[in-house]
Every structure is written in structure tokens, then in C-alpha cells.
Amino acid sequence: MKKIIFLVLFLIFIFKDIKSSYGVDLVNFKMITLLSNNFNDLGFNNMLNQGKVNVEKQLGITDTKVYIVDGYNDTKALLLPMVQNEDVDFVMCTSLGHVEACKEIAKMYEGSLTIKTQFMVRGSSNATSNLLQVTYNYASINYISGVFAGLYTKTNKIGFLSPGLLGGSADCFVYAYWLGAKQINPKIEFYYYNIGAFLNSDKTTRATAELLDMGCDVIGDTLDDFSAGNTVISRGFKALGTNGFPQREVYGENVVFSYSYNWTKIFLPIVKNALVKGKPKNNYADFNIDPTLNFYDISYGFDVPQDTKTKINDTISYLKSTPRAIHPTNCNDLMLKYAEKWNLTMSTTYDRTKCIAGSNFFFINEPFPGMTYFGYYNITNTQVKFSPSIQIGVSIVSGVLIAIVLLSMVGVYKYRASSSIRSASPIFLIFILFGALIVFGGIILWVSELNDHVCNGRLWMVTLGFSTLIGSLVVKNFRIWLIFDNPELKTVKITNYQLYPWVACCLVINIILMSILTSLGDLREVDATGIDSLGKYEFLKICKMNNSGASVLYTILAYFGALLLTGVFVSWKIRIVDIEEFNESRAIAHTLYAISFCLFVIVPLMISPLEKQSETIILSVAGLFITTAAVLIIFLPKFYRVYEYGEEGTNEMFKSKKSSNIATARAESHKSSNSGNHRTNRRGNLVSGDFTDDSESSVIEPNQEVADVTSGAVLADFTEESVSEIDENEKNHNDEIELPEINQSEQQNSEIEQPPPPPPPQQIEPDEKNQD
């Protein structure tokens, strides 16, 4: 028990001793450190953090925090609430980006009785009651780095990277590097870029690569990280470690020269003074004759000649023993002309013909004669283009299909007199082919280099093409339905001129919707970044529209869906047509089914996230497949029959008198329900010679007598071309109708006298033969 009491008393004594040594309760001493970037950067921030950690260890400070922040607004927003509410004793603002915000907060509470926080910032202005400033001679170490570069280069071409004014640092330090190299090696050529920030690894890497491509074999920088050095090493050169971190400890002999900052020597006396609430004192760091105060530690590679080391060490000794105001960077033969050109002030204390005023050194920003300045480095985004092989392949296939469609048009025109072509109406076949032609052209645009016109044009072409193709198919199907869904066999006039408005209506709807999309949708080409698998500096040209345009596009898709569903429904209604001659209805149905199936596959794919190139490939291939399938299904059987049976249609199906079971059944059913009003068919077997392009599909007047529904009658109804010659006779021969040839018995049974005053209807007894 006595031992425990003794141990407690001993600890209390030690604690009191610590408190009395520094005059402050270390347990309650709170310190905050602000860094501009992560301290794992193997550069400037790493060394700052290392100095902070060493101070904490030596002084026994435990309540410390590190925050990564940069810029005035962010720094103030972070720091001010902590100073107001957390009783912070000391704040180290280590970056130039912290200076303004930290100065402003310090001024707000200068002389405050409640907030005793002291601030450390970068700079050389006068200290205040709660603010001190720290600076180090960055020009001298860059001058030494330049001396090494001038001695070590083999190509006499050296380069440099700096943040520039936009990054918060004038190029006076670039000048110091160049001057050291030029004075030791007058033959050197010097090239440099501004990066625009202390930390931008992407720009640094690319700018370094360009300097290497120019022939530079030694490259220095005043940036925070080691991106430049990594690029140099990756290209097989030796790197310089010029960002304050001992790079040779990490990269070994790949780094031929490096210097490091010893921030512990700067921070330790400053924090000690803050512990005792002493008056803030500024601090200055540089090469120093006293090793305990020397801020820079230099390390060389094994292959550096001793003569080079000797020259550098002699230069460092000169800098240590010479006032900063007359260092070579401030006083030289080039300075007077430069100062006169850029309105800088020369020194009033030292040689006015060579020495610039100390404060004016930091206004040196423009290049001296002999310095080649390339400006701020900008990364040009690289366009990722659509796969050339896919683009060429789709274009070639589309071109071949266009040629096939054109040949098909020629074939339709050439064989328009053949029964196979005439039975399907050549003009509608041309419509279908023309729609396919437009679609194939749109597919070529779909995989072409994008611009605003292509974005709009390809959508116009594809939608108009499909409207023409599908609209013609649906209208033809609708005609079939009207003809076969006619149990009373009444007169049904369906001429081509009656069908044209329906096709035109499909196109008009499409044009209206596309016009709305074009005017309101803002459909245009944009350079998209950050999509798919694009790199940070890559872009892809895509077509983009606003929400209004997307809504109209969905409306267009819904319109096509309704058009297809109508076609599918009508095709289903005529599925029971059993006459082989009219199997085009099934072909049209198959086409619509194929299109519907493809669309139901495509739409979910389009809704789900896809890479733009994959989306383009799917849409292009689907468009080619749908259109090609439609053309083949409709036209291949027709041209085969032309090839097989000749232009005159020798196939017996156009001459046989085959009855339609469906139509006959409907006629007989209607006959049984209308006894006493029996009809006979007066049209007989109409041959294909009666067909023209302006047909009137019809059945005889309802009050005439009919005997049977034959294939000839149905064929006449379907082909659109059966009685246009009769129409012409009605127009040109004073309403005389030349009826088709019928048999003698039907003629005798159908004669009706027509005296001037019409007598009561004469009852005609039909032949037994026609009773069946």
C-alpha cells in the first residue's frame, strides 16, 4: 500500500514539474495543424506533418488535430467555429492557401480576453500579439538545385514545373533555378511550364513527359508531390527530389539529388513560446552555418562526381556567409535591364546596377532572356471514337442492303405486269422498299461521326422510314381484313387512292411528333465525360436532348407500338384465310411479329444502363435486322414466283377455280338466313389480265343473284386491281359497264327487261343447275 501511495505522489510531482517547466498545463494545451493536402504525398505536406509529430514528441503534447483544407473560404469555414468554441491554444497554418483566412481570424481576436489563440502563418510581415509568420529562403535552395542540374545534364537541356501565379506562387523560384544552371553552364537550354496548382498529378505527369520528349534529361519542380519524379524514373532517367521530401530514402539511386526540409527546427521554438504564452516572434529558415539551425538537408546519388559535389558545397558555403539581399538571385548583371522592363525597384542599399530590392524579388514572374516559357499546361481531352471496324462494317452492310433495295425497286417496276407483283399492288411495294431505303440510310448516319445535324437527321430518317414501311404493311393488311370480313358480299370499294391517305396519315403523325421533338427537345451533340469506361481526360460524342425531347421520343415510341399492335391485331383477324394465293397476309403478319419481338427486346435494353457504344451497336443491328427481315419476308416469295413461273404468271393458282372455304361458308350461312332472296355470282373466274394499278375491289350489286364464291372473285377483291378498267369504261363510255365474261345459262337467267316506264319486278326462276 505504501508503494502505491509513493508511486501516485511521484507521478503528481512529475506532472507538477512538467507544468512548472513550461508554465502551462500540457494536458489541456490544444494545437491544430492545417495542411493543404494529405500528408502521405511524399512531399511538402509529409515533411510538415513530420515536423509537427517531432514537436509533439519532444514537448509531450497530446491534444493535437490535423485538418486538410486549402483556400480562403474553406479554411475560414473550418477554422473559425473551432477557434470560437473549442478553446484552441495554437494554430499552425502551413500553406500559402491558409494565410488570408488565418490572418483575418487572428485580427478578429487580437487583444481578446476570452480567446487566447495564437496563429502561425507563412510569410514575412510583422508579427502581432497573436500572430507570427514563418518564411524560408526558397530561392536559395532552387538556385542550388539549378547548379546541380547545369552540372549533371548530358543534353544541356533542362526543364522545370511550377504552380505559377494561378497556383499561388510567382515564378521567381523558376528564375532562381534557371540562374543557378545558367551561371554554372552557359550552354544550357531551359524550358518550363506552369501547372496552375501545387498539386495536380495529371497535369504534372503529362507536362513532364512533354519536357522529356523535347530532350530534357534533368527536370526540377516546386510542386507538392513527386509526380514529376515518377514520370522521369518511368522513362529511364534519374530524378531530382525538389519538393522537400527525402526522396532518396524511398527511391534510392533512381533519385540522383534531393533536398529535404527540417521543419522540426522551425516549429520547436515557436511551439515552446506558445506554451508559455510568450509574445509571438517571426522565424526565418535558410542554409545556416550553425548545423542546429540549418533548414535544408541535401543528399546525392552515388554516381554524382565528387567535383560536382565540391562545386555545390562551395556555393552553399558562399550563400551561408552572404546576406540574402546580395545572393546571386538578387544581384547579377541581368537584373537592371529586367527591372527596367518590368518596372521593378532596384536596391537602395546595395549596388543599384545589379541588385533588386528585396521585396521586389517576389514580383519576378516574367521569363528572363534565355528562358523558354510554354505557359500554363492544359490537358486536352482526348476523344474516344466509335469503333472504326464496327462503323465500317455497319456502313458496308447498309450500303449493300441499299443496293439490294434499289434493285428490288427496279425488279418491281420491270415485272409490274406479272401476276405475282400485280396481285400485291406495285405502288405499295415501292412504298415499302422506299421506307427500307430511308431506314438503311439512317443506320449509316447512326454510326457516323456525330454533330448536331447528324443527331437530328438520323432520328428523322429512321422514324420516317419505319413509318413508311410499317404504315404500308398495316394498310395492306387492313385491306385484306375488309375484303374477307364481308359475309354479305356487299360492294367494297378499296382503290389505291383510298389507301394513300392512310399511309400519308402515318407519315404526318410522325412528322408532327418529330417537329415537336426538334423544336423543343434541344437535340444536339455534346462531348460527354465521366460516362461508360472513359478516362478522366477522355470524352465521347453523344446525342443528347432535354426532358421535353425525351417525353416526345417516348410518345413516338408509343405511336410505333400502337401502329404495330394494330397490324398484329388485323393480321390475327385474317389468320383463317385458307386460300394459298393470298399467303401474303401471313408474310405481313410474320413481318409485324418479327418487328414487335425485336422492339420488345430492344426497349428493355435501352432502359437499362448501357455503354453508349454498345447502345449504338444494338440499335444499328436491330434496325438492319428488322428492315431486312421485312423486305425478305415480303419480296423474296414474289420474286421467286416471277423467276419460277415467268413474267406472265403461268402458275395455275391464277387460273384455277378454287373456292375459299371461309368465304363460301359465310355466303351459304347468309343465303340460308335470307331465303326467297337468293343470289348468284355473276363474276365467274376473273383472270389476272383484268388487274390494273387503280383497282376497285368489289362484289356485284347486292340485288343481283349469285351462285358461288370462287377464287376468281376473291382474287379480284384482294388484288386492288380487278375492276379499274370497268371504272374507266364508266367514265369514258357514258356509264356503259363492260362486265366480265359469264356462262350462257347465267346470262339467260339474269336478263331483265328495261321498258321506259319501269314495270313491276319480274320474278325469274333460276336454273336447277344454279340452285346448288
UniProtKB/Swiss-Prot annotation:
Positions of the UniProt region annotated as Disordered: 664-772
GO molecular function, one term: G protein-coupled receptor activity
Compositionally biased region (Pro residues): 754-763
Chain intervals with Low complexity compositional bias: 740-753
Membrane topology: Multi-pass membrane protein
Keyword flag Secreted: no
Primary localization: membrane
Alphabetized PROSITE patterns for the sequence: G_PROTEIN_RECEP_F3_4 (PS50259)
Annotated GO CC locations: plasma membrane
InterPro entries per the UniProt record, alphabetical: GPCR_3_C, mGluR/GABA-B-like, PnrA-like
Regions that span the bilayer: 392-412, 427-447, 464-484, 501-521, 552-572, 587-607, 617-637
UniProt keywords, alphabetically: G-protein coupled receptor, Glycoprotein, Membrane, Receptor, Signal, Transducer, Transmembrane, Transmembrane helix
Protein name: Metabotropic glutamate receptor-like protein G
Gene (name only): grlG
